[in-house]
Amino acid sequence: MAFEVCRHRHDARWIVRLGDAVYGSYLDKEQALLDAVEAARDALQAGREAQVWVRERSDSARIF
């Protein structure tokens, strides 16, 4: 499973996506990242593979 941290299209807020599902609405990227990493760690503890990606306009980066 891949958690994606990105900006919401309609405003300046950050969101966390997992597939087609959208979680949260964050004022800054740091809070979105913290929640995404926590969710990925929970998934790993449950025996599932998990990654966290930051998607920005010009590039993407895997951070966890």
Summary of predicted features, one role per range:
Residues L18-L33:
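A short, exposed loop/beta-hairpin motif centered on an aromatic-Gly-Thr core
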Residues M1-V22:
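Short aromatic-glycine-(Arg/Gly/Cys) micro-motifs in beta-strand/loop hairpins
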Residues C6, A21, A36-V37, G47:
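Low-complexity, intrinsically disordered/propeptide-like segments
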Residues M1-A2, E30-E38:
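Charged, amphipathic alpha-helical segments
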